[in-house]
Structure formats: C-alpha cells, structure tokens
Design a protein with these regions (language model features):
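Accessible peptide chain termini
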Residues: 1, 215-216
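Domain-level signal for Mg2+-assisted phosphodiester chemistry and nucleotide/NA-binding surfaces
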Residues: 1-55
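Extended two-metal-dependent nuclease catalytic cores across DNA- and RNA-processing enzymes
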Residues: 16, 39-215
Length: 216
C-alpha cells in the first residue's frame, strides 16, 4: 500500500524527483505541554509498522527527529531547505510557507498565510488531537473574527477571555496547534522551541492587516 502511494507521487512529480519520508518519533514534545494530547490515540502501532519503516529505509531517505511528529519534521526540513514540495493531505501543513501538494492540487503558501492559518487553528482547535480551542469557534468563524479584528495575538486573547478562558489557555492551544519551522527547533539540544508571541504579535494578512507586518 505504501509503495502504491509513493508510485502515485512519483507519477505526479516525475520519476527523477527525490522522495524523503518523514515519520513521528515515539516521544512527543506536545505531551510536555498537555499530557492528555492525543490521549485517545495511545493504541500501539499496527503490527509490522517498524518492519515497513525499515524496508522503506532501504529504498528512500527516512527522517525521524527526536520528540517531533512527522508534520513538524517536514516543517523544519522544508523551511531549512526551501524549494522542496511538502506532500500531505493534513490541513495543518497549510502553516508552512512554500509549496504544498495535498494529493489533489498544488499551491504555494506565503509566510503570512501560514502564520494566519496557525492563529485560526489556535481558535478553532483540533478535537482529533485533543485540544479544543475556543468553544463555539470553528475555522470559518475564526477567519471571520480575524478579518474583522485583525490577525493578532490580541484578537486571540480576547476570544479566549470572552469565553472565560485564560491567557495560559490561549498559549497552550497556540503551542499545540503550531507546526514547527526551522526557527522553532534547537538542533544542538534536539528539542522544540516553544512558541512565545509578544503582546504586539500581528500578521500582515486579512482585511484589517493590509499595512502591518508579521512580528514575533
């Protein structure tokens, strides 16, 4: 099954395209932020999982980074080595600037679009991964709010506080939602750098942000 999917990808990009495969480490830095993260997924890997990876290693370059999920490893690699194409159907990868192929279409994501999508996911949460965002806010409502108020950390905090939640709740959701880039990883310590926005963090994206720039 894995080889079938890889053959499809080769056919999409040409037989001479190099394919690098990314897999999640057995440890996950997000569990340090929220121990119950993906708690409902604590089932063992399928029988033969390691054997499949070991077989793929004989034919492809395989990358597994300490304490990172595959999405994070792709994000770090893609931003460290611009010009590559991320292949993933996961909506989380819309945070990473560069080219993305979601198995249906290819499109280019700007740094501003990626940063804006991260903030939207912070508000909407991801029930599959076990963090809820702001109750009652989904992706469409989050985007409508940001287009009205501006894509900023201030807007995020207000949305959380309006529902009786705290700044700490907002930060936990933002850190869980964020897919790492090369700037979010300490290669010497081999660990994630947790996202820490300034109070003035704002993204140059959306109806209220045309003349503003992305700041950390």
């Amino acid at each position: 099954a894995a080889q079938r999917e890889l053959t499809k990808i080769r056919n999409e990009f040409g037989a001479f395209s190099d394919i690098i495969l990314f897999f999640s480490d057995t440890k996950n830095f997000r569990k340090k932020i929220m121990p119950e993260y993906k708690g409902h997924r604590n089932r063992k890997k399928p029988c033969g999982y390691k054997r499949v990876i070991n077989q793929l290693k004989t034919e492809y370059e395989v990358i597994i980074m300490p304490e990172l999920e595959a999405d994070d490893s792709m994000g770090v690699y893609a931003t460290q080595n611009p010009g590559n194409i991320i292949v993933s159907p996961d909506k989380d990868m819309k945070q990473i600037p560069g080219e993305l192929y979601n198995l249906n279409e290819r499109f280019t994501i700007t740094k501003e679009e990626g940063a804006a999508w991260h903030l939207s996911q912070c508000l909407s949460g991801d029930q599959t991964d076990g963090y809820g965002g702001v109750p009652g806010i989904g992706v469409k409502r989050a985007e409508a709010l940001f287009n009205k108020e501006g894509y900023s950390w201030k807007t995020v905090l207000k949305a959380f506080k309006d529902k009786g939640l705290t700044e700490e709740d907002a930060l936990v959701n933002a850190r869980l939602a964020r897919i790492l880039t090369v700037d979010d990883y300490d290669f010497k310590k081999q660990e994630a750098r947790l996202w820490s926005p300034s109070s003035s963090y704002r993204v140059n994206y959306g109806a209220r942000s045309k003349d503003e720039s992305t700041r950390g």
